[in-house]
Amino acid sequence: MGTARFLSAVLLLSVLLMVTFPALLSAEYHDGRVDICSLPSDSGDCLRFFEMWYFDGTTCTKFVYGGYGGNDNRFPTEKACMKRCAKA
């Protein structure tokens, strides 16, 4: 039973790394920190339905968020998204 749990944990960690690592590679960094506005949209892991906004590099776009997980390029309103990500 211990081996099965270990393998399950390794599998889960592998999946999380496969999902997270490409997003981090595509992100832009400023002062050593990830620019959240450069992250891709990420609907998360759950199956709930929340209308949210993400910055697509040009403007804020509506998407469906599942309620858990995802990344920080997620805003409750278009106004909040534009305030954080739109360049003047």
From Swiss-Prot:
One of its GO terms (biological process) is envenomation resulting in negative regulation of voltage-gated potassium channel activity in another organism. Residues 37-85 form the BPTI/Kunitz inhibitor domain. Residues 1-27 form the signal peptide. The record marks 47-48 as: Reactive bond for chymotrypsin. PROSITE patterns: BPTI_KUNITZ_2. The record marks 39 as: May bind Kv1. Expressed by the venom gland. Residues 28-33 form a propeptide. Keywords: Disulfide bond, Protease inhibitor, Secreted, Serine protease inhibitor, Signal. SUPFAM superfamilies: BPTI-like. Gene3D superfamilies: Pancreatic trypsin inhibitor Kunitz domain. One of its GO terms (cellular component) is extracellular region. It is found in: Secreted. Serine protease inhibitor that inhibits trypsin at a molar ratio of 1:1. PANTHER family: EPPIN (PTHR46751), WAP FOUR-DISULFIDE CORE DOMAIN PROTEIN 6A (PTHR46751:SF1). Belongs to the venom Kunitz-type family. 03 (sub-Kunitz) subfamily. This is Kunitz-type U15-theraphotoxin-Hs1a.
